[in-house]
Each structure stands twice: as C-alpha cells, then as structure tokens.
UniProtKB/Swiss-Prot annotation:
PANTHER family on file: ASPARTATE AMINOTRANSFERASE
Class of the enzyme per the UniProt entry, highest EC level: transferase
Classification via InterPro entries: Aminotransferase_I/II_large, AspAT/PAT-like, NHTrfase_class1_PyrdxlP-BS, PyrdxlP-dep_Trfase, PyrdxlP-dep_Trfase_major, PyrdxlP-dep_Trfase_small
Name of this chain's protein: Aspartate/prephenate aminotransferase
Gene this protein is translated from: aatA
Native organism: Rhizobium meliloti (strain 1021)
Amino acid sequence: MAFLADALSRVKPSATIAVSQKARELKAKGRDVIGLGAGEPDFDTPDNIKKAAIDAIDRGETKYTPVSGIPELREAIAKKFKRENNLDYTAAQTIVGTGGKQILFNAFMATLNPGDEVVIPAPYWVSYPEMVALCGGTPVFVPTRQENNFKLKAEDLDRAITPKTKWFVFNSPSNPSGAAYSHEELKALTDVLMKHPHVWVLTDDMYEHLTYGDFRFATPVEVEPGLYERTLTMNGVSKAYAMTGWRIGYAAGPLHLIKAMDMIQGQQTSGAASIAQWAAVEALNGPQDFIGRNKEIFQGRRDLVVSMLNQAKGISCPTPEGAFYVYPSCAGLIGKTAPSGKVIETDEDFVSELLETEGVAVVHGSAFGLGPNFRISYATSEALLEEACRRIQRFCAACR
C-alpha cells in the first residue's frame, strides 16, 4: 500500500516558488543573480497598517477569531465592495482566509465533484489547475493569443463550456501576463456566461488596484449583475498594500457558498491570524494614497522593461495594462544555440540558459500553460531591472 495519497500524482510543485528558491541558492553560493520571479511588491507595508497591528497586540487581540473573520473586517470588506465596485454584499456574505489561495481552494473543495470541469484561460496562475485537481475537478485550458494581448475571446469561452462545466476562473489583471479586461471586453464574456446558467464564475481580483494610465478596472458581476447569484469575487490586501506575508485574502458571494467554505475552513485552519486581520481592517478603511504612489512607480518600471525587452534580439513584449508582470515571447530564440552550446528548444531551455549564463532568474511560460514565453516580475528597483534587461539583451545577442 502506497503511503502518499494518489492525489499528489495529479499535482506539480509551484514553478514560481522553485525559481525563487533556485535564485536564492545561487546567491548563497556567491553567484551574482537578479531574481525576477517573485510575485510580491518590493515595498514595505504602510506605517499606519503596521501600527494597527501593534495596537491590536497591545489591546490583547491575540485569541482565536471567528472562522470567517472578525466582524470589523467583514464589515470593512462589504463596504469596500460597495465603495469601489458598486457591489452590494452583507458582512455575512463575506469570508476571510489565510491568503487568497485558501479562499480559492476552499471554494473548489466546497463545490467540485469528480468529473466537474473548470474553465481556465491560459496563461494562468500556476496554482489554479493544481487546486482544481487536488479537489477532484478537471481543469480545461483555453489558450489566448499574444496578438490579443493574452485576453480570452468570447467565442473561445463559449466553445470551452460543456454540460460538465462548473466554474469559469477569471483573473484580471492577470498573473502572469498583466492583461486587464476593459468593461466592453468583460461584457462580451459575461454575455456568454449568461447563456450558460449552470456555470459559476470565480473572479480573482487580487491585482485590482494595479492598473495603469487611464484604464478603469471592472469585475464581472459589476458589469453583469445577472451573475450575482453565481459569482464568487475574491480579493485581498497582499498586492495593493504590500502585505503578502500577512496572509489575508477575502471574498464575497452567495450566502450558501460562503457557509460551505466556512465549514471547510473550520475543519482546516479556522480563522486567519488575528493580528493580520486587524491590520487588514486598517488597510481597507484607512488612507489609500499608498496605492496611487506605488502605481506611478510600477508604471515607470513597466515602461522601462517593455522598452528594453523589445530591443533584445528575438524577444517580443506586449505592454500589459496591469499587475507587475510582463510576459514576453522568446519565439525568436527557439532553435538558436545558446553561448553554452546548447540548442534552445523550449522556453524552459531559454530561462535555464539565461540563468546559467547571465544570472537572471525568470519563470518559463510553459509553467503558466502558454509558451514560448517567460514571465518577469518588475516588482524590484529600476536599477536592477535595467541591469537585468541589459543582461537579457546580451544573452539574446550571443545566441546564434
């Protein structure tokens, strides 16, 4: 009898975590490595949020909390959805988890049965299909195209839906591509979803506040209120407020789904860390100027990286609307010989050779379900980004 569960055979380790770990190992050995694999802001958590956590400690807010979150945070979440997304939820329709990942996992665990399908546009965040598989479902991938800026077309979504489809997973702005959908682009997708009343929508809005220029963020149920009773809208404080380590995600949706997720979480982790929840209350209710300042910084970094990558031989990099990633194509390098003498046959070969030759760590696109591409996180200083892009240019020029 095997000791480990059969379910593990359906799951792969996280490629993004693996890249960051590899970069750390090389740095520990003395290598000059620039790591561009991390999916977190390089800013510190704002002082007012840290102070709220310290105040909570001083007040003795160190006990177990209700499974779905402290009332103050659930009220703040409901107000946030009304204020920023024009969505009406009661506090009872919200839930707080230990990061957005737990929210998503609990939603799948609460709803998926063997044979249920989950439609996921590619490229996708690496954890979506793995969570679906762990929960007994079947991921169904729908490739997007670079010429469409990696945005799903309505007709492709329509073709992917079957009687077995239970969820459509929607992420805008996207990890890994940075693609963000306009109101009009979203309306085309929601029109399709209205034709299929058995399909639920799981929307990952974690990068909501990281859009650039005049782009206006919208979320599916805001665009099509008819989806309200079958949409779970997930968000969190990690990206917008530089709070990745605090591990607070949240969602709002139909009460019966929230109750089911609460039941699972109650037998899993119970409530998220009390101090982190009080910090999240301040993040949502307190001053929001931190977000605007950081958007300007990220936009400058994005423009720098896109410009420099498009000067590299064999690289094509579209300009994303949001998040802090770019997703360039390395198709022009496939079939070329790297400085080491190895022929680059895949995007995985490209990123491996780039790391060994130039010490730049990025994530191969095949990990996100669409290649030959690679993901760069520009959540680091302009000086490091400029140096990394120079190294990429040098590597590409040396390929023959």
